[in-house]
């Protein structure tokens, strides 16, 4: 398997040797999907939001594939993390080093984010939920904050 900047939908392409990885044939389908979550998170955070160290970052769906990728990238960048997910995922997310985890089903995440950030709101929010969550995300966005929507699971 290789990584390429272009030709993502091609059946064949040329790739530098240092971007090739041996993958056992029985794992090809799984291996092909691995970069998707991390590249999605990285593109949103670094290229679209230009997230910076010490900014507050709200990750909706922090327990999912893109959410965990965003969490790990944010930790590497020194970003302050707030996440929303189902209550049963809270222990896992806490074990990954996230202090502020909100159960979006039983808590008002907008109020909690404002409380956690001393009323300032999140500097960057990634929202995969859509619907009412998108509206509430705007309500807890810091002045000059950046909100990025992707892969809605509900109609906006």
Regions found by a protein language model. Give the residues of each.
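Terminal helix/beta-alpha structural elements that buttress the NAD(P)+-binding lobe
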Residues: 1-156
